[in-house]
Regions:
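Nucleic-acid endo/exonuclease domains
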Residues: 1-143
């Protein structure tokens, strides 16, 4: 990866400091569902795009009966990415009811053949995103 690509990633991710210590301006893009992306979703989407990841669907409903959405999904390879915000602020994903609901969702996804990658705040790194892209590419090649 060259320096231009890394700089692009840094500029597209407001939580990342650029080498000179400045922070890029935050950006907000509308999701296909009509709501705005969280800063964590923006960070992931920006990193994914900068690394030339394959197209993903956001807010993808994978279950035939339940209305559970994945934050991002690559349906052709049954690969999902779930962003787990609020780990340090007693967010929904870490409180009892939300945690149990997430367990039900992830278990149902597994039973349907989905691979779910869970990324918490601080885990959206070039290395982790490249690992997910590699997983998708390998599954595509195996078809």
């Amino acid at each position: 990866m060259n320096g231009d690509k890394l700089l692009k990633i840094a500029r597209e991710n407001p939580d990342v400091a650029i080498e000179d210590g400045t922070h890029p301006e935050p950006r907000s893009k509308a999701k296909s569902s009509g709501r705005k992306r969280s800063s964590l979703e923006q960070q992931f989407a920006g990193t994914w795009a900068a690394l030339d990841g394959p197209p993903l669907e956001d807010e993808y409903r994978f279950h035939p009966k339940r209305r559970w959405p994945f934050d991002f999904a690559h349906p052709a390879t049954k690969t999902a990415i779930e962003l787990e915000g609020g780990a340090w602020s007693n967010g929904r994903h870490t409180r009892g009811k939300g945690f149990i609901a997430d367990c039900e969702k992830y278990n149902a996804a597994g039973l349907l053949g989905w691979t779910v990658f869970r990324l918490a705040t601080g885990m959206i790194t070039v290395a982790n995103v490249q690992d997910i892209i590699g997983h998708i590419r390998r599954k595509e090649a195996a078809k």
